[in-house]
Protein backbone atom coordinates (compact mmCIF):
# COMPACT_ATOMS: atom_id res chain seq x y z
CA UNK A 1 0.00 0.00 0.00
CA UNK A 2 1.40 3.38 -0.97
CA UNK A 3 1.77 5.99 1.79
CA UNK A 4 -0.60 8.95 1.66
CA UNK A 5 0.55 12.11 -0.06
CA UNK A 6 1.70 15.04 2.04
CA UNK A 7 -0.98 17.67 2.60
CA UNK A 8 -0.51 21.40 3.04
CA UNK A 9 -2.94 23.98 4.36
CA UNK A 10 -2.46 26.31 1.41
CA UNK A 11 -5.21 27.08 -1.14
CA UNK A 12 -4.63 25.84 -4.67
CA UNK A 13 -4.81 28.26 -7.59
CA UNK A 14 -8.19 28.30 -9.32
CA UNK A 15 -6.77 29.48 -12.64
CA UNK A 16 -3.73 28.69 -14.73
CA UNK A 17 -2.74 26.71 -17.80
CA UNK A 18 -4.39 23.48 -16.71
CA UNK A 19 -1.12 21.86 -15.68
CA UNK A 20 -0.68 20.57 -12.17
CA UNK A 21 0.96 23.36 -10.15
CA UNK A 22 2.03 22.81 -6.57
CA UNK A 23 0.59 24.65 -3.56
CA UNK A 24 -0.02 27.95 -5.35
CA UNK A 25 -2.13 30.74 -3.90
CA UNK A 26 -5.50 31.72 -5.28
CA UNK A 27 -5.25 34.29 -8.07
CA UNK A 28 -7.74 36.34 -10.06
CA UNK A 29 -8.49 35.48 -13.68
CA UNK A 30 -6.74 37.65 -16.26
CA UNK A 31 -8.58 40.91 -16.81
CA UNK A 32 -7.64 41.07 -20.49
CA UNK A 33 -6.04 39.09 -23.26
CA UNK A 34 -8.11 37.14 -25.75
CA UNK A 35 -5.51 34.83 -27.33
CA UNK A 36 -6.14 31.18 -26.50
CA UNK A 37 -2.95 29.75 -27.98
CA UNK A 38 0.53 30.86 -28.95
CA UNK A 39 -0.36 30.33 -32.60
CA UNK A 40 -2.91 33.15 -32.34
CA UNK A 41 -0.14 35.54 -31.26
CA UNK A 42 2.39 34.58 -33.92
CA UNK A 43 2.44 36.81 -37.03
CA UNK A 44 0.15 39.28 -35.26
CA UNK A 45 2.70 41.27 -33.26
CA UNK A 46 1.35 44.71 -34.23
CA UNK A 47 -1.70 44.14 -32.04
CA UNK A 48 0.25 42.36 -29.30
CA UNK A 49 0.07 43.59 -25.71
CA UNK A 50 0.55 42.00 -22.30
CA UNK A 51 -2.23 41.87 -19.73
CA UNK A 52 -2.11 44.88 -17.36
CA UNK A 53 -0.16 44.68 -14.09
CA UNK A 54 1.05 46.81 -11.20
CA UNK A 55 4.54 46.42 -9.76
CA UNK A 56 3.09 45.66 -6.33
CA UNK A 57 1.29 42.65 -7.76
CA UNK A 58 4.62 41.16 -8.80
CA UNK A 59 6.12 41.81 -5.37
CA UNK A 60 3.17 40.26 -3.59
CA UNK A 61 3.04 37.25 -5.91
CA UNK A 62 6.67 36.42 -5.07
CA UNK A 63 6.82 37.28 -1.39
CA UNK A 64 3.48 35.74 -0.45
CA UNK A 65 4.46 32.38 -1.91
CA UNK A 66 7.99 32.43 -0.54
CA UNK A 67 6.96 33.26 3.00
CA UNK A 68 4.22 30.65 2.86
CA UNK A 69 6.92 28.15 1.89
CA UNK A 70 9.12 29.30 4.78
CA UNK A 71 6.19 28.79 7.13
CA UNK A 72 5.26 25.40 5.67
CA UNK A 73 8.78 23.99 5.68
CA UNK A 74 9.93 25.42 9.03
CA UNK A 75 8.97 21.95 10.26
CA UNK A 76 10.10 19.54 7.55
CA UNK A 77 10.32 15.77 7.49
CA UNK A 78 13.64 15.61 5.66
CA UNK A 79 16.13 18.35 4.75
CA UNK A 80 18.59 17.74 1.92
CA UNK A 81 21.66 19.97 2.05
CA UNK A 82 23.08 20.51 -1.41
CA UNK A 83 21.25 20.20 -4.73
CA UNK A 84 23.99 18.72 -6.87
CA UNK A 85 23.64 15.42 -8.73
CA UNK A 86 23.64 13.41 -5.50
CA UNK A 87 21.19 15.64 -3.63
CA UNK A 88 18.80 15.87 -6.57
CA UNK A 89 18.89 12.10 -7.04
CA UNK A 90 18.15 11.63 -3.35
CA UNK A 91 15.26 14.09 -3.54
CA UNK A 92 13.79 12.39 -6.61
CA UNK A 93 13.98 8.93 -5.07
CA UNK A 94 12.68 10.00 -1.67
CA UNK A 95 9.82 12.09 -3.05
CA UNK A 96 8.83 9.26 -5.39
CA UNK A 97 8.75 6.60 -2.70
CA UNK A 98 7.44 8.72 0.19
CA UNK A 99 4.98 11.33 -1.11
CA UNK A 100 3.82 11.78 2.49
CA UNK A 101 7.10 13.45 3.53
CA UNK A 102 7.79 17.19 3.34
CA UNK A 103 11.24 17.53 1.80
CA UNK A 104 13.18 20.81 1.93
CA UNK A 105 16.27 21.20 -0.25
CA UNK A 106 18.78 23.88 0.76
CA UNK A 107 21.28 24.92 -1.91
CA UNK A 108 23.93 27.61 -1.40
CA UNK A 109 24.21 28.44 -5.09
CA UNK A 110 21.75 30.40 -7.16
CA UNK A 111 21.79 27.58 -9.73
CA UNK A 112 21.18 24.06 -8.38
CA UNK A 113 23.03 21.19 -10.03
CA UNK A 114 26.48 21.56 -8.49
CA UNK A 115 29.16 20.31 -10.86
CA UNK A 116 26.72 18.39 -13.05
CA UNK A 117 26.16 21.10 -15.67
CA UNK A 118 29.31 19.99 -17.49
CA UNK A 119 31.50 16.92 -17.70
CA UNK A 120 35.23 16.96 -17.01
CA UNK A 121 37.37 20.01 -17.80
CA UNK A 122 34.30 22.02 -18.88
CA UNK A 123 33.45 19.50 -21.63
CA UNK A 124 29.80 18.90 -22.49
CA UNK A 125 29.34 15.13 -22.35
CA UNK A 126 28.54 13.31 -19.10
CA UNK A 127 29.82 9.79 -18.47
CA UNK A 128 28.14 7.27 -16.16
CA UNK A 129 29.34 3.73 -15.53
CA UNK A 130 26.76 0.99 -15.59
CA UNK A 131 24.41 0.26 -13.87
CA UNK A 132 23.76 4.00 -13.32
CA UNK A 133 22.02 4.11 -16.71
CA UNK A 134 19.03 2.54 -14.94
CA UNK A 135 18.45 5.89 -13.24
CA UNK A 136 18.67 7.64 -16.62
CA UNK A 137 16.01 5.24 -17.90
CA UNK A 138 13.88 6.08 -14.86
CA UNK A 139 13.89 9.83 -15.54
CA UNK A 140 13.90 9.59 -19.33
CA UNK A 141 17.35 10.92 -20.26
CA UNK A 142 18.72 9.53 -23.56
CA UNK A 143 22.31 8.32 -23.81
CA UNK A 144 24.78 6.50 -26.03
CA UNK A 145 25.76 3.01 -24.89
CA UNK A 146 29.52 2.46 -24.87
CA UNK A 147 29.51 -1.03 -23.36
CA UNK A 148 30.50 -0.69 -19.70
CA UNK A 149 29.45 2.95 -19.53
CA UNK A 150 26.99 5.35 -21.13
CA UNK A 151 27.38 8.93 -22.36
CA UNK A 152 24.76 11.68 -22.09
CA UNK A 153 25.38 14.15 -24.91
CA UNK A 154 25.34 17.14 -22.54
CA UNK A 155 25.48 17.08 -18.76
CA UNK A 156 22.94 19.91 -18.69
CA UNK A 157 20.37 17.59 -20.26
CA UNK A 158 20.66 15.24 -17.29
CA UNK A 159 20.66 17.99 -14.67
CA UNK A 160 17.81 20.04 -16.13
CA UNK A 161 15.65 16.93 -16.61
CA UNK A 162 16.24 15.70 -13.08
CA UNK A 163 15.73 19.15 -11.59
CA UNK A 164 12.44 19.68 -13.42
CA UNK A 165 11.12 16.36 -12.14
CA UNK A 166 12.20 17.08 -8.56
CA UNK A 167 10.65 20.55 -8.55
CA UNK A 168 7.36 19.19 -9.88
CA UNK A 169 6.85 17.02 -6.80
CA UNK A 170 4.24 18.70 -4.58
CA UNK A 171 6.13 17.68 -1.43
CA UNK A 172 9.52 19.20 -2.36
CA UNK A 173 10.63 22.81 -1.90
CA UNK A 174 14.00 24.10 -3.10
CA UNK A 175 15.50 27.01 -1.17
CA UNK A 176 18.39 28.06 -3.40
CA UNK A 177 20.82 30.92 -2.72
CA UNK A 178 20.49 29.71 0.89
CA UNK A 179 23.40 28.40 2.93
CA UNK A 180 23.39 26.02 5.87
CA UNK A 181 25.47 27.70 8.59
CA UNK A 182 25.05 25.16 11.37
CA UNK A 183 23.22 22.04 12.50
CA UNK A 184 20.50 21.86 15.15
CA UNK A 185 21.38 19.26 17.78
CA UNK A 186 19.67 17.44 20.64
CA UNK A 187 21.40 15.49 23.43
CA UNK A 188 21.57 11.76 22.67
CA UNK A 189 24.05 10.35 25.20
CA UNK A 190 25.21 6.77 24.93
CA UNK A 191 27.15 4.52 27.28
CA UNK A 192 30.25 5.13 25.17
CA UNK A 193 29.77 8.87 24.69
CA UNK A 194 27.80 10.93 27.22
CA UNK A 195 28.24 13.99 24.97
CA UNK A 196 26.76 12.41 21.85
CA UNK A 197 24.04 14.30 19.98
CA UNK A 198 21.56 13.64 17.24
CA UNK A 199 20.89 16.09 14.43
CA UNK A 200 17.44 17.69 14.52
CA UNK A 201 17.52 20.34 11.81
CA UNK A 202 19.58 22.98 10.04
CA UNK A 203 20.50 26.62 10.59
CA UNK A 204 20.15 28.71 7.43
CA UNK A 205 20.94 32.13 6.05
CA UNK A 206 21.02 33.84 2.68
CA UNK A 207 24.26 32.78 0.99
CA UNK A 208 25.23 36.40 0.37
CA UNK A 209 24.83 37.08 4.09
CA UNK A 210 26.90 34.00 4.98
CA UNK A 211 29.70 35.27 2.76
CA UNK A 212 29.87 38.59 4.63
CA UNK A 213 29.95 37.66 8.31
CA UNK A 214 33.55 38.93 8.42
CA UNK A 215 32.68 42.47 7.33
CA UNK A 216 29.15 42.88 8.72
CA UNK A 217 27.87 42.24 12.23
CA UNK A 218 24.76 40.86 13.87
CA UNK A 219 23.25 38.90 10.99
CA UNK A 220 21.54 36.06 12.82
CA UNK A 221 20.21 33.03 10.92
CA UNK A 222 16.94 31.15 10.52
CA UNK A 223 16.17 27.49 11.23
CA UNK A 224 14.41 24.44 9.81
CA UNK A 225 13.54 21.59 12.16
CA UNK A 226 13.57 18.06 10.76
CA UNK A 227 14.13 14.61 12.28
CA UNK A 228 16.44 13.63 9.43
CA UNK A 229 19.04 15.43 7.31
CA UNK A 230 20.72 14.20 4.13
CA UNK A 231 23.97 16.07 3.53
CA UNK A 232 25.40 16.02 0.00
CA UNK A 233 27.56 19.15 -0.02
CA UNK A 234 30.50 17.76 -1.99
CA UNK A 235 34.18 17.54 -1.17
CA UNK A 236 36.03 20.13 0.92
CA UNK A 237 35.62 23.75 -0.21
CA UNK A 238 34.06 27.07 0.85
CA UNK A 239 30.65 25.40 1.31
CA UNK A 240 31.76 21.81 0.63
CA UNK A 241 31.85 18.99 3.19
CA UNK A 242 30.10 21.40 5.53
CA UNK A 243 28.20 18.95 7.70
CA UNK A 244 31.07 16.56 8.35
CA UNK A 245 33.46 19.43 9.13
CA UNK A 246 30.91 20.72 11.63
CA UNK A 247 30.65 17.27 13.20
CA UNK A 248 34.40 17.31 13.78
CA UNK A 249 34.29 20.76 15.38
CA UNK A 250 31.41 19.56 17.61
CA UNK A 251 33.51 16.53 18.57
CA UNK A 252 30.98 14.12 17.10
CA UNK A 253 33.58 12.77 14.68
CA UNK A 254 37.23 12.37 15.72
CA UNK A 255 38.64 13.74 12.46
CA UNK A 256 38.14 13.68 8.70
CA UNK A 257 39.76 10.95 6.67
CA UNK A 258 40.60 13.34 3.84
CA UNK A 259 39.76 12.65 0.22
CA UNK A 260 42.40 10.55 -1.55
CA UNK A 261 43.68 10.86 -5.13
CA UNK A 262 41.69 10.01 -8.23
CA UNK A 263 40.92 6.33 -8.84
CA UNK A 264 37.67 5.77 -10.69
CA UNK A 265 37.79 2.01 -10.27
CA UNK A 266 37.71 2.08 -6.47
CA UNK A 267 36.13 5.45 -5.73
CA UNK A 268 32.65 4.96 -7.11
CA UNK A 269 31.97 1.62 -5.42
CA UNK A 270 33.25 3.00 -2.11
CA UNK A 271 31.04 6.09 -2.18
CA UNK A 272 27.85 4.18 -2.96
CA UNK A 273 28.47 1.34 -0.52
CA UNK A 274 29.41 3.65 2.37
CA UNK A 275 26.53 6.11 1.99
CA UNK A 276 24.99 5.95 5.46
CA UNK A 277 23.78 7.66 8.61
CA UNK A 278 27.04 8.96 10.09
CA UNK A 279 25.50 10.19 13.33
CA UNK A 280 21.85 9.85 14.36
CA UNK A 281 19.77 12.15 12.18
CA UNK A 282 22.46 12.86 9.57
CA UNK A 283 22.95 10.78 6.43
CA UNK A 284 25.99 11.66 4.31
CA UNK A 285 26.32 10.88 0.61
CA UNK A 286 28.29 11.81 -2.47
CA UNK A 287 31.74 13.37 -2.36
CA UNK A 288 31.19 14.71 1.15
CA UNK A 289 31.48 11.10 2.27
CA UNK A 290 34.98 10.83 0.79
CA UNK A 291 36.15 13.43 3.32
CA UNK A 292 34.82 11.26 6.17
CA UNK A 293 36.17 7.93 5.02
CA UNK A 294 39.29 8.94 3.14
CA UNK A 295 37.91 7.53 -0.11
CA UNK A 296 39.38 8.27 -3.51
CA UNK A 297 37.86 10.85 -5.82
CA UNK A 298 36.43 9.57 -9.10
CA UNK A 299 36.76 12.65 -11.27
CA UNK A 300 34.48 13.20 -14.29
CA UNK A 301 32.17 10.21 -13.97
CA UNK A 302 28.81 10.68 -12.30
CA UNK A 303 27.30 7.26 -11.66
CA UNK A 304 28.35 7.16 -8.02
CA UNK A 305 26.78 10.55 -7.34
CA UNK A 306 23.45 9.38 -8.70
CA UNK A 307 23.40 5.99 -6.99
CA UNK A 308 24.72 7.43 -3.72
CA UNK A 309 21.68 9.72 -3.80
CA UNK A 310 19.41 6.74 -4.40
CA UNK A 311 20.99 4.89 -1.48
CA UNK A 312 20.78 7.97 0.76
CA UNK A 313 17.04 8.06 0.13
CA UNK A 314 16.80 4.35 0.91
CA UNK A 315 18.73 4.87 4.16
CA UNK A 316 16.43 7.77 5.05
CA UNK A 317 13.31 5.68 4.56
CA UNK A 318 14.83 2.96 6.72
CA UNK A 319 15.47 5.17 9.76
CA UNK A 320 12.89 7.94 9.38
CA UNK A 321 10.20 6.46 11.63
CA UNK A 322 12.70 6.01 14.47
CA UNK A 323 14.10 9.52 14.09
CA UNK A 324 10.61 11.00 13.88
CA UNK A 325 9.64 9.29 17.13
CA UNK A 326 12.76 10.69 18.81
CA UNK A 327 12.04 14.14 17.41
CA UNK A 328 8.53 14.11 18.84
CA UNK A 329 9.70 13.34 22.38
UniProtKB/Swiss-Prot annotation:
Q: Where is it found, in Gene Ontology cellular component terms?
A: cytosol; nucleus
**Annotated localization:** Cytoplasm; Nucleus
Q: Where mainly located?
A: cytoplasm
Domain of life assignment: Eukaryota
**Enzyme category, top tier:** transferase
Annotated substrate binding lies at 86, 107-108, 115, 180, 220, 235, 287, 297-299
Post-translational modification here is noted as: During the catalytic reaction, a sulfide is transferred from Cys-218 to a reaction intermediate, generating a dehydroalanine residue.
Kindly list the cofactors needed: Fe cation
* Reaction catalysis annotation: [ADP-thiazole synthase]-L-cysteine + glycine + NAD(+) = [ADP-thiazole synthase]-dehydroalanine + ADP-5-ethyl-4-methylthiazole-2-carboxylate + nicotinamide + 3 H2O + 2 H(+)
Q: Which GO terms describe its biological process?
A: mitochondrial genome maintenance; thiamine biosynthetic process; thiazole biosynthetic process
Q: What is its EC number?
A: 2.4.2.60
2,3-didehydroalanine (Cys) modifications at: 218
Instruction: Provide this UniProt record's keywords sorted from A to Z.
Output: Cytoplasm, Iron, Metal-binding, NAD, Nucleus, Thiamine biosynthesis, Transferase
A single GO molecular-function term is: iron ion binding
Q: How is the cofactor bound?
A: Binds 1 Fe cation per subunit.
Any Pfam family from its record, for instance, is: Thi4
Q: What does this protein do?
A: Involved in biosynthesis of the thiamine precursor thiazole. Catalyzes the conversion of NAD and glycine to adenosine diphosphate 5-(2-hydroxyethyl)-4-methylthiazole-2-carboxylic acid (ADT), an adenylated thiazole intermediate. The reaction includes an iron-dependent sulfide transfer from a conserved cysteine residue of the protein to a thiazole intermediate. The enzyme can only undergo a single turnover, which suggests it is a suicide enzyme. May have additional roles in adaptation to various stress conditions and in DNA damage tolerance.
Task: Please give the subunit comment from the record.
Answer: Homooctamer.
Assigned protein family: Belongs to the THI4 family.
Report what the protein is called: Thiamine thiazole synthase
Source organism phylogeny:
Eukaryota, Fungi, Dikarya, Ascomycota, Pezizomycotina
Amino acid sequence: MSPPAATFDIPVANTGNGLSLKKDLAVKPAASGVAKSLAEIEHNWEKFTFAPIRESQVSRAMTRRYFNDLDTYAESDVVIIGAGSCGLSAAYTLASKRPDLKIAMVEAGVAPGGGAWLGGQLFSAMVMRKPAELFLNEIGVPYEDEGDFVVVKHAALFTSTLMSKVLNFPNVKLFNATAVEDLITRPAPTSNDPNAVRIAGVVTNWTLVSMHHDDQSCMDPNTINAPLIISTTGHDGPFGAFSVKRLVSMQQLPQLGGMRGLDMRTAEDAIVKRTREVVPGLIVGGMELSEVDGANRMGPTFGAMVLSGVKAAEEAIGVWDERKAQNDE
